[in-house]
Amino acid sequence: GGGNDTSNETDTGTSGGETAAVDAEAVVQQKCISCHGGDLTGASAPAIDKAGANYSEEEILDIILNGQGGMPGGIAKGAEAEAVAAWLAEKK
């Protein structure tokens, strides 16, 4: 027998048709802070640290998907956009 165990199993974190939970905060760190600021209190784009006080989750999702003002749409899509909208809607 050989001494090398070269198994073909790779753990990708997802299996089958399951949707892995999206880390909304990580998406925000990757896609939002460059314009909205590290603490989301605004930079070249407005503050979104209290987005939930001004917008519903549905409104936030619409802005993420379609853009508003100087923000282009589609910076986050699908499950990422939905997770970020839900996360921001809790910020009040």
Swiss-Prot record:
Is a lipoprotein in vivo. Binds 1 heme c group covalently per subunit. Belongs to the cytochrome c family. It comes from the Bacteria. Keywords: Cell membrane, Electron transport, Heme, Iron, Lipoprotein, Membrane, Metal-binding, Transport. It is a peripheral membrane protein. InterPro entries: Cyt_c-like_dom, Cyt_c-like_dom_sf, Cyt_c_BACSU-c550-type, Cytochrome_c550/c551-like. Its main location: membrane. One of its GO terms (molecular function) is iron ion binding. This is Cytochrome c-553. Natural electron acceptor for a formate dehydrogenase. It is found in: Cell membrane. Residues 1-13 have a biased composition (Polar residues). Residues 1-20 are annotated as: Disordered. One of its GO terms (cellular component) is plasma membrane. PROSITE patterns: CYTC. Heme c binds at residues 32, 35-36.
